[in-house]
A protein has these predicted regions:
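Conserved mid-domain beta->alpha element of the FAD-binding
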Residues: 315-381
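Glycine-rich FAD pyrophosphate-binding loop
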Residues: 25-48
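Long, low-complexity C-terminal extensions of enzymes
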Residues: 359-501
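Dinucleotide-binding Rossmann-like beta1-alpha1 core, especially the glycine-rich loop
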Residues: 47-133
Length: 501
């Protein structure tokens, strides 16, 4: 009789380590799977922040994490959207929000109604028909109303990275996950499988399955036969990230701010006790020496404390599962944080792994399915991030001119061409970003579709006009009913007591 996987060793650091360990234990512990965590030295600094997509909430529900307590512990703030500015010189900023997909009804996407109206003189932008965008502009949090209506939106988070990772570690400990800490001194292989790892203190750990959550170090995966990291250097010109802190904002916004400049972009992420400042840039345009001095000017905020610079290398492992070793998070797929997808990548890898968790400890044909899904998953996220650069309109700047001319993957080219023709997005398997996300991005970047779905013309004009007007009224009314960010996090009373509001 074939033997099942009994022990899983998760080797890594920070949030990815503890999310993976806790999720595997929660999902498979009752089936007899024992999880061991090996904690490597943290790469986080006090200034670091996790900016997340709404999908993280589903991971929290799986792990039984109380949202309010988590946000309070990690100085967290709900984020309804991202606001992009200066990606096209002279163009107005635009929002990317997280509206929920309506239930299937056979109707065409609302964006097609809007597009026809726009071509016939409608002067109201699509953002005003998005509940998430409306909430972001008003400083509101799109919470569930429970009325069963089609209009709903979700929100991501801004989280203090170190505190959040520590909270996950404590959760794993409470769930009975045994952990060790140190550095990897040796990895013992037999064929294409890991038999054991040894820590620098002499501790030896054996397991049936090893999960590499070590980030860019890929401490286990790069020991595996045939392991290769595929750089996306030709698509992404930024190779540095700098993080710092600024004072907390007097009134918490419902969005993060992403502003382009001559050599990259700078992001402002609201937290309760500070504002995280992150810039991603090309070191051949802006030097590491000059960037800390430029950061306050770019952020338009005084920066306090030390700014930390690190190298980034976007790309992915050609095979994130080899033998009995599986990479998750940044170890599998490395992205710059322009779309707040870092923890979503970790979550996506973990979810795919659990879905194809090996049935036996001796042979693991599930690796092929995982590798195929991860390539599709990574390619879709890469394409969305790349679209920001390819569609930029910052002309006569070497970095941005080069970004527009970058080689575009066929999957992205298909989306761009189809949208330019008829305002439609080709959504495939393993997509992270919805039709609405892509539509807001391309319209915000200045793409003007030549036409629209011809089926719209089969409907009488009067019902179309009423549908558009009703949607606009409903979004405006519902957004104003939502709580402000300060109300959501319970900060209103504190501000009033301090005489701030």
């Amino acid at each position: 009789m074939t033997r099942r996987v009994e022990t899983v060793a998760v080797v890594g650091r920070d949030a990815a380590l503890w999310l993976a360990a806790a999720a595997v234990q929660r999902s498979l512990g009752a089936a007899g799977v024992r999880v061991v965590a090996v904690e490597l030295p943290s790469w986080l600094n006090a200034v670091d922040c996790y900016s997340t997509l709404p999908s993280l909430a589903s991971m929290h529900r799986l792990l039984g994490i109380d949202e309010a307590k988590m946000l309070e512990a990690a100085s967290g703030v709900p984020v309804a959207a991202q606001r992009f500015s200066n990606w096209s010189k002279g163009a107005a900023p635009f929002f990317l929000a997280y509206d929920d997909e309506p239930p299937p009804s056979g109707d065409l996407p609302f964006s097609q109604y809007w597009l026809k109206g726009h071509k016939e003189g409608l002067r109201v932008g699509l953002e005003d028909f998005s509940l998430g965008c409306a909430c972001a502009k008003l400083g509101r949090v799109p919470v569930a109303t429970g009325d069963g209506g089609e209009l709903s939106a979700s929100y991501g988070y801004s989280l203090d990275a170190s505190i959040y990772a520590e909270a996950l570690k404590q959760l794993a400990s409470k769930r009975g996950i045994v952990s060790s800490s140190g550095k990897i001194a040796d990895v013992t292989l037999k064929g294409d499988c890991i038999r054991s790892i040894e820590l620098d203190d002499g501790t030896r750990i054996e397991a049936d399955l090893f999960i590499d959550a070590s980030g860019a170090e890929r401490v286990l995966m790069m020991k595996m036969p045939g392991a290769k990291f595929e750089r996306w250097k030709d698509q992404f010109g930024c190779d540095r990230i700098i993080t710092a802190s600024a004072a907390p904002l007097k009134s918490l916004p419902a969005f993060s701010q992403i502003s382009a400049f001559r050599g990259g972009w700078v992001g402002l992420y609201p937290l309760r006790d500070r504002t995280a400042v992150v810039a991603v840039y090309a070191s051949d345009v802006v030097s590491d020496h000059s960037m800390p001095g430029e950061l306050p000017l770019l952020a338009r905020m005084a920066v306090s404390g030390e700014a930390v610079v690190a190298e980034i290398k976007p790309g992915m492992l050609e095979r994130p599962w080899i033998g009995n070793c599986v990479a998750v998070g940044d170890a599998a797929i490395a992205l710059e944080p322009v779309d707040a997808a870092q923890l979503h990548v970790a979550q996506g890898c973990i979810s795919h792994l659990i879905a194809v968790f090996p049935a036996t400890a001796d042979e693991m044909p599930e690796a092929s399915a995982y590798n195929k899904s991860m390539r599709s998953f990574a390619g879709n996220i890469r394409d969305f991030a790349l679209a920001h650069y390819v569609l930029n309109r910052r002309f006569d700047e070497l970095f941005w001119d080069k970004a527009r001319e970058a080689e575009v993957p066929a999957t992205l080219r298909q989306k761009l061409d189809l949208f330019a023709a008829r305002g439609t997005v080709a959504i495939g398997d393993d997509e992270t970003f919805s039709d609405q996300n892509w539509t807001l991005l391309m319209l915000g970047a200045g793409v003007e579709p030549d036409g629209y779905d011809p089926r719209i013309d089969l409907l009488p004009d009067e019902p179309q006009i009423e549908k558009v007007q009703q949607r606009l009224r409903a979004v405006s009314q519902l957004a104003r009913q939502m709580p402000s960010v300060d109300q959501f996090v319970g900060r209103t009373e504190q501000l009033q007591a301090a005489g701030v509001v």
